[in-house]
Each structure stands twice: as structure tokens, then as C-alpha cells.
UniProtKB/Swiss-Prot annotation:
It comes from Borrelia duttonii (strain Ly). This is Large ribosomal subunit protein uL16. Belongs to the universal ribosomal protein uL16 family. Residues 1-21 are annotated as: Disordered. GO terms for molecular function: rRNA binding; structural constituent of ribosome; tRNA binding.
């Protein structure tokens, strides 16, 4: 699963996601993309589940790009632990996804197959998504 090798600070405050994506909102590498219609944090496990679903649907054909990376630590205290005694340890890593972020890109497969693979991947994610085609194709 995806996680950063080295971070400046081990723990971080949760924060909120507001507004639309200013960066990462255009298709850069592939022909087709999966764009978020909501803002949320996506875990490394959800990204991996979506990637596996896409690659299995296209039977390892074509190329898939993951455009988001989980670099936000999510901390959690152990079960049945009293409050206090400091912030909990890092439980997993999240990727911040704003409205309009291109999360996955794909190329080298027919449009119908790419769309079905992206829709299968979107069922693994906690945000509403839409399938987009690069403008300079048609």
C-alpha cells in the first residue's frame, strides 16, 4: 500500500477540505480519467482496492496512473483506552481529494472498457465520481 517514506512531522491535525481543486484537475498522462465530485479523505487501502479493481477489469491491458497519494497521517488511540496520555499513534494514511481532482487516469484500452473499469473502481471509493475523456481526443 502507498505511504510516505519519510515525513517532517509524524502526526498532524485533521483539518478540513474546502473549495475546488486548483491543481491536479486536468488529465495529464492518459486518455481517460476518474474525477471526484465531492471532497473527502481517501485511505491508502481504498486507493489500492480501486487500482486492483481497474487492472483486473482491463485484464492487465493498458496503463493506469494513480494521481493521488496518501501523505496525511490519521492517528487513533487503542480501543478501551482512557482519554489523555497524548495523541494516539498513526493508524493509516489518507489522501486529500477536493472537488474536481483527477484521481486515476488510464490509456491503451477502448473507451467502453475504460469506462466500465473506472466505474468499478469508483464503487470502492467514498466519493461520488465521474468518468472524463481528454479533450484533445475528440
Amino acid at each position: 500500500m502507498l505511504s510516505p517514506r519519510k515525513v517532517k512531522y509524524r502526526k498532524k491535525q485533521r483539518g478540513r477540505l474546502s473549495g475546488e481543486a486548483q491543481k491536479g484537475n486536468k488529465i495529464s498522462f492518459g486518455e481517460y480519467g476518474l474525477v471526484s465530485l465531492e471532497a473527502d479523505f481517501i485511505t491508502a487501502r481504498q486507493i489500492e482496492a480501486a487500482r486492483v479493481a481497474m487492472t483486473r477489469r482491463v485484464k492487465r491491458g493498458g496503463k493506469v496512473w494513480i494521481r493521488i497519494f496518501p501523505d496525511i497521517p490519521y492517528t487513533k488511540k487503542p480501543a478501551e483506552t482512557r482519554m489523555g496520555k497524548g495523541k494516539g499513534g498513526v493508524d493509516h494514511w489518507n489522501a486529500p481529494v477536493k472537488l474536481g481532482t483527477v484521481m486515476f487516469e488510464m490509456s491503451g484500452v477502448p473507451r467502453e472498457l475504460a469506462e466500465s473499469a473506472m466505474m468499478l473502481a469508483s464503487s470502492k471509493l467514498p466519493v461520488k465520481t465521474t468518468f472524463v475523456v481528454r479533450r484533445d481526443l475528440r
